[in-house]
């Protein structure tokens, strides 16, 4: 269970039932650590029921016991549910967090708020002019539980991802880090995490940017060499290369319209088959693949693989990604796109 509800208590006042308003205000303000003037305003309200926000919401057991011990008329403790995240920072950006009334504010909490929150129960009864409950018929409506949502997340893998992120941050102190693990057959997300992270149990302790930016979803970045598989798959499908028979000679760089694009290996890989181009992750070799495909076909396959548009994942903040405008692409843009640069 990645998140659950726990029972907590909140302070509710019935001002008409409170006889010594000054004393009640003094004692409650002392217990809650709020000002006497503010509490006196609460107990003096001309309302049938008064909630004390936010000091009187989701009280600790110790605070609740102190209020109970006062045994004042018109002072009640109402049981409420509070969302609890037992794993704290684990998967926090994906799960999201809720506000004081358990309304979803980000992540899955926001997307599925309507289904998770359920419906409150209620008791309807008659009272006299002083707010005293009358012994007459009452109507009780049962509460309805929210649904339980199952995720594709592998908890053990997620724990490994969180540990790896912490190690990366400790070793390299980057501004941010992110890891995403996906099932290549189904597209299901198996693990996803980023740093900086936050504990949704105490989300108010963090700045807005930290708690609301789910970096694997929100951020755009160049895929780099991981993108080469797209160029390779497109070339195989179009039969523009023979992996085993065709060769490419890498001198360490390739000139495209006056632009020099370098291989990661100084001096290059020499003559190699295109299978070896793949094995060596040779940038000039992939430029050659892109040239053989041509701009139109390369971009067509890139779009068919889903780049440049949202996946439709059920998380807020997903970006479209960025592609070159095909009508403005020249040989250099085609070349860099072929090995994963200039695309995000």
Language model segments and positions:
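Small/polar-residue-rich segments within soluble enzyme cores
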Residues: 6, 22-30, 41-146, 340
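Solvent-exposed coil/turn segments that connect beta secondary-structure elements
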Residues: 6-7, 14-18, 58, 80-82, ...
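Envelope-exposed proteins and targeting segments
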Residues: 7-11, 73, 88-93, 108, ...
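Extracytoplasmic/secreted envelope proteins and their assembly/folding machinery
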Residues: 8, 21-29, 64, 68, ...
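A short, polar/charged loop-to-alpha-helix boundary motif
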Residues: 8-25, 197-213
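Short N-terminal helix-loop-first-beta-strand/juxtamembrane motif that initiates sensory/input modules
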Residues: 73-77, 170-184
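Beta-lactam-recognizing serine transpeptidase/beta-lactamase-like catalytic domain environment
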Residues: 128-138, 179-225, 230-344
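Conserved, well-ordered alpha-helix/loop/beta-strand core segments that scaffold catalytic motifs
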Residues: 134-177
């Amino acid at each position: 269970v990645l998140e659950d509800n726990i029972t907590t208590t909140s302070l509710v006042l019935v001002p008409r039932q409170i006889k010594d308003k000054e004393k009640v205000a003094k004692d409650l303000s002392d217990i809650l650590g709020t000002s006497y003037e503010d509490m006196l305003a609460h107990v003096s309200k001309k309302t049938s029921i008064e909630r004390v926000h936010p000091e009187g919401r989701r009280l600790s057991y110790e605070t609740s016991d102190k209020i109970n011990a006062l045994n004042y008329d018109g002072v009640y403790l109402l049981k409420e549910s509070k969302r609890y995240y037992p794993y704290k920072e684990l998967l926090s950006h994906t799960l999201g967090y809720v506000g004081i009334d358990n309304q979803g504010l980000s992540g899955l909490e926001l997307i599925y708020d309507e289904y998770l929150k359920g419906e409150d129960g209620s008791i309807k009864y008659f009272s006299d002019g002083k707010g005293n409950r009358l012994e007459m018929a009452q109507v009780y409506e049962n509460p309805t539980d929210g649904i339980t949502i199952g995720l594709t997340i592998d908890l053990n893998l997620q724990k490994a991802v969180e540990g790896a992120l912490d190690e990366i941050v400790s070793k390299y102190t980057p501004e941010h880090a992110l890891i995403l693990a996906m099932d290549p057959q189904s597209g299901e997300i198996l693990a996803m995490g980023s740093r900086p992270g936050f504990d949704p149990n105490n989300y108010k302790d963090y700045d807005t940017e930290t708690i609301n930016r789910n970096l694997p979803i929100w951020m755009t970045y160049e895929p780099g060499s991981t993108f080469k598989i797209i160029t390779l798959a497109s070339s195989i499908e179009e039969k523009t290369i023979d992996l085993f028979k065709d060769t490419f000679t890498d001198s360490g760089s390739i000139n495209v319209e006056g632009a020099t694009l370098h291989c990661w290996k100084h001096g290059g890989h020499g003559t190699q088959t295109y299978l070896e181009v793949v094995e060596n992750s040779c940038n000039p070799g992939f430029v050659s693949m892109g040239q053989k495909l041509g701009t139109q076909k390369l971009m067509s396959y890139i779009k068919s693989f889903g780049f440049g548009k949202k996946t439709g994942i059920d998380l807020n903040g997903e970006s479209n990604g960025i592609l070159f405008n095909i009508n403005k692409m020249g040989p250099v843009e085609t070349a860099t796109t072929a090995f994963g640069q200039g695309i995000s």
